[in-house]
């Protein structure tokens, strides 16, 4: 293999590949990227077995077709240190040579035949969804995905595919986030996508996309990328049962005012006590020491008697920071029962702190 490519092009490709590499054990072939130069195209693959990425470009010169693997992190480190302009990559005797002007580097390679085989979309069901709807939905539910939960299914997000709609859901057991979008699908299936995959999808896809899935994999194609992730095998909680069926009190609140008040309290305490009066909402810190914070905003609530809830401020801010509207709804029942934050097709059910 012998190619010449602009630094900016190969650097950008290698940067996108980094999250997909095995970082801890460099003896594993999954710490390497797979590079194929053929048919006037460069194709690069990276995978840690759980998620994988294919990136390709025809913006290069191929002097000799071929394949090679090389440590993805070290190759990026070398490319980064070089100047802007053309970089030469050439394989000789199972060694990858990287050169530019008077600078020369070489990296050992593994047998490219040992590189993992990627799943293919043929024979899998297809989801018709535009990238904006997908990314917007995933962005809203990402903060509620748990990490390191012994119940593996909670370390991912549910994509509940129905014939006329798709529900995106996540929970860390203290809150539940759900986004519902209208969407046509040929078949129904619920899949659980790992959090790492959810995060990477949001970085990659902005243009037209095609989604394919089965019980084991989710595959996404765009003009620039092909992405896959293994799915989590488990049973996601019955999220529809967690959402309160009836709401006693629904308030319309200003997002900016709420964020400002909550952030003032978080300088002292993560947990905040909120008291709803008839025309005022009071915010107070909940802290074990003698440090206190208190602020209030003017807002007509309709409460005749004070209504108090206590909550982890992060749950409120995560919701407020992902919505685009200037106003949102909060649905309240009793102080110690879950309350609901609403913005259009997005809702978050939050368990309050019992005080």
Residue spans of the language-model regions?
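Structural preference for solvent-exposed beta-strand-turn elements
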Residues: 1-355
């Amino acid at each position: 293999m012998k190619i010449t490519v602009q630094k900016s092009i190969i650097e950008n490709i290698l940067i996108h590949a980094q999250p997909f590499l095995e970082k801890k054990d460099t003896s594993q072939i999954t710490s390497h990227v797979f590079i194929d130069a053929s048919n006037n195209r460069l194709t690069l693959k990276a995978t840690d077995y759980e998620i994988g990425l294919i990136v390709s470009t025809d913006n290069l010169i191929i002097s000799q077709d071929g394949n090679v693997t090389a440590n993805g992190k070290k190759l990026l480190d070398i490319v980064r240190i070089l100047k802007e302009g053309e970089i030469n990559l050439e394989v000789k005797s199972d060694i990858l040579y990287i050169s530019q002007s008077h600078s020369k580097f070489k990296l050992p390679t593994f047998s490219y035949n040992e590189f993992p085989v990627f799943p293919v979309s043929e024979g899998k069901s297809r989801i018709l969804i535009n990238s904006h709807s997908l990314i917007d939905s995933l962005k809203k539910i990402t903060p509620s995905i748990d990490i390191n939960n012994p119940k593996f299914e909670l370390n991912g997000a549910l994509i509940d595919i129905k014939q006329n709609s798709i529900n995106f859901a996540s929970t860390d057991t203290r809150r539940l986030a759900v986004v519902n979008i209208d969407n046509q699908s040929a078949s129904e299936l619920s899949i659980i996508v790992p959090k790492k995959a959810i995060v990477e999808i949001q970085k990659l896809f902005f243009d037209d996309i095609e989604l394919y899935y089965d019980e084991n994999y989710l595959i996404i194609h765009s003009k620039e990328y092909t992405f896959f992730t293994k799915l989590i095998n488990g049973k996601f909680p019955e999220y529809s049962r967690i959402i309160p069926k009836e709401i006693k009190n629904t308030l319309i609140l200003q997002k900016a005012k709420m964020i400002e008040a909550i952030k003032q309290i978080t300088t002292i305490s993560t947990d905040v006590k909120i008291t709803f009066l008839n025309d005022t909402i009071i915010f107070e810190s909940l802290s074990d020491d003698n440090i206190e914070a208190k602020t209030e905003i003017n807002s007509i609530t309709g409460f005749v008697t004070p209504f108090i809830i206590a909550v982890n401020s992060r749950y409120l801010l995560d919701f407020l920071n992902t919505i685009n509207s200037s106003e949102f709804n909060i649905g309240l029942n009793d102080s110690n029962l879950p309350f609901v934050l609403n913005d259009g097709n997005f809702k978050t059910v939050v368990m309050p702190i019992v005080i």
